[in-house]
């Protein structure tokens, strides 16, 4: 699972995900990628699941780049606990994805049909709507 080594603050406000992404909207390393269409929170377990799905579909060939990292803590109070008495403990970590952000990339030494298949399988595992992008289209 992806968890930051150090964090400036233990807990953060909930906040809102507004606007489009400022950076990370183009392919930098590979030739095929997964780009978000809508805003949402991607948990560290989603990132790990997608990494495993892509690597299994590609049969360990090619290279995968994960372009995001979960850096926002999400706190939760236990069940059967009354309101008040402070904020709950950190439950998991998320990446707040804005529309237009590239999440994953795959190298060009994989055939396009196989890369598209792997990334379409990965789309089903993510909580945000995504689309397949490539340098060749």
Swiss-Prot record:
Example of a GO biological process term? translation
User: A Gene Ontology molecular-function term?
Assistant: rRNA binding
Q: InterPro entries recorded for this chain?
A: Ribosomal_uL16, Ribosomal_uL16_bact-type, Ribosomal_uL16_CS, Ribosomal_uL16_dom, Ribosomal_uL16_sf
Q: Which Gene3D superfamilies match?
A: Ribosomal protein L10e/L16 (3.90.1170.10)
Its GO CC terms are: cytosolic large ribosomal subunit
**Pfam families, alphabetically?**
Ribosomal_L16
Cite the entry's keywords alphabetically: Ribonucleoprotein, Ribosomal protein, RNA-binding, rRNA-binding, tRNA-binding
Q: Which CDD domains match?
A: Ribosomal_L16_L10e (cd01433)
What does the UniProt record say this protein does?
Binds 23S rRNA and is also seen to make contacts with the A and possibly P site tRNAs.
| Alphabetized HAMAP family for the sequence | Ribosomal_uL16
Family, according to the entry, reads as follows: Belongs to the universal ribosomal protein uL16 family.
Please give the subunit comment from the record. Answer: Part of the 50S ribosomal subunit.
Query: What is the name attached to this protein's record?
Result: Large ribosomal subunit protein uL16
Give the source species.
Answer: Wolbachia sp. subsp. Brugia malayi (strain TRS)
Organism placement in taxonomy: Bacteria, Pseudomonadati, Pseudomonadota, Alphaproteobacteria, Rickettsiales
- This protein's gene is called rplP
């Amino acid at each position: 699972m992806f968890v930051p080594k150090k964090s400036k603050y233990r807990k953060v406000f909930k906040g809102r995900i507004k606007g489009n992404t400022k950076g990370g909207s183009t392919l930098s390393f590979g030739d095929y990628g997964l780009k978000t269409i809508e805003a949402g929170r991607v948990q560290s377990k989603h990132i790990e699941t997608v990494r495993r799905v892509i690597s299994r579909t590609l049969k360990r060939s090619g290279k995968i780049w994960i372009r995001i990292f979960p850096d926002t803590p999400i706190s939760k109070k236990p069940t059967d606990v009354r309101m008040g008495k402070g904020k709950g403990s950190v439950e998991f970590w998320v990446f707040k994805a804005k529309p237009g952000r590239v999440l994953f990339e795959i190298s060009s030494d994989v055939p396009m049909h196989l890369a598209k298949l792997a990334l379409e399988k990965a789309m089903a595992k993510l909580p945000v709507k995504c689309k397949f992008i490539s340098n060749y289209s």
